[in-house]
Amino acid sequence: MKRGYLHSIGRLRHVLRLCALALVLALTPVIIKADDDNLLKVDRVDFSVTLSDGNAYTIAGFLYYKGSFRNRPLQVLVHGGSYNHKYWDAPTINGQSYSYARFMAEEGYALLAIDQLGAGESSKPAGDFVTLNETTLSIHQVLAQMRSGNNPLGYAFQQIVLVGHSFGSINSIFVQGTFHDADALVVTALGHVPHELPIPPELIIALAQFPYFPLPAEARSALFYFADAADADVIAYDNLNLADLLTRGQLFTTFAAVFNPAADRVGAVTGPVLVQLGEHDSLWPSLYAGGEAAFWTNASSVTVESLPIVGHAFNTHLDNKTGWKSINRWIRSTLAVN
């Protein structure tokens, strides 16, 4: 009898193990799906654009989102000169996060960080062809594709915010003033109040000898960083891994539009605008923030913010999140995003 009792106990344990295994197998797809919904993803998305010469070119984009990109506001990120899309997705260094794209994806946005014409993995036509007009025409076509659904994702975004940095801000202003593609515009590290820029004329003359050229590391460090508010390891990483090339066409057209409101079409921009200027930006400091709003004569609203403790490359300074959080609040308020 004892032997039969022990045998029954053994069978019961075996059955319980099988039931437990079946339960685990039944729940496994649900667990994987839950993990997948919480996963931050980055997808390569290429756009075909046609420029003034009638030829097709490729603009490389990188889509950041968490779970799904559907039913989310889209931020289209436009990097500045001598950068590519990686400006928006610098890594964590010494425990500090420097990725604007990943920060905003965690906040519920979809973000398309593009490599502008002539930079990163986008097409590289002749350097003199890559001008303000051609660059902005390519950005316009990317925005139109994302709005219409005629894009590699096959999805039409209902709310689009155009976000620029430095030269990318000039291009974004021109696009919005010409085509009005976005629902809102965020301009960082770029102002319109005339002042002297700390760029030696001899440097410009030297760079203009080449159709594509890098900015020297010493110049990038001095112009883009407020050393007291940045990690030296990040500055070194920037020069080694984030730096890209500029074109002579951009030098003579985009740079020439810096303090020319008619050239960048700031007065033709409609819709809401947020401008962020850094206190220690050696190129466009917040010292001139008080006069900035006057240039946006047709914008439905203009908010100008001064950010302390940052230099020109906002994202790669230690206090980057002050500006990021403010952009997030402004977009949510402006577009009524939940």
Please provide the spans of the model-predicted regions.
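Short, surface-exposed "cap/lid" segments of acyl-processing enzymes
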Residues: 69-109
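N-terminal cap/lid segment of alpha/beta-hydrolase-fold proteins
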Residues: 36-70
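Catalytic histidine-centered segment of alpha/beta-hydrolase-like enzymes
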Residues: 310-321
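Conserved alpha/beta-hydrolase "acid-adjacent" motif
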Residues: 278, 282-290
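Short beta-strand/loop motif that positions the catalytic acidic residue
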Residues: 269, 275-277
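Alpha/beta-hydrolase fold nucleophile elbow
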Residues: 152-166
